[in-house]
Curated annotation (Swiss-Prot):
It comes from Sodalis glossinidius (strain morsitans). It is found in: Cell membrane. GO terms for cellular component: plasma membrane. Its main location: membrane. This is UPF0391 membrane protein SG0393. HAMAP family: UPF0391 (MF_01361).
Length: 53
């Protein structure tokens, strides 16, 4: 999940450096969404893992 976030971040940085504003904004938005989903899934797995023990 974090791998996809990093990939979208790199795409956004490259697009921003080359001047493609719309593509950079879209890739940055996708990276934020993937990052937030990854954090939420991490927290869920952290709490459910502790309850099982």
């Amino acid at each position: 999940m974090f791998r996809w976030g990093i990939i979208f971040l790199v795409i956004a940085l490259i697009a921003a450096a080359l001047g493609f504003g719309g593509l950079a904004g879209t890739a940055a938005w996708a990276a934020k969404i993937v990052f937030v989903v990854g954090i939420i899934l991490f927290l869920i797995s952290l709490f459910t893992g502790r309850r099982g023990r």
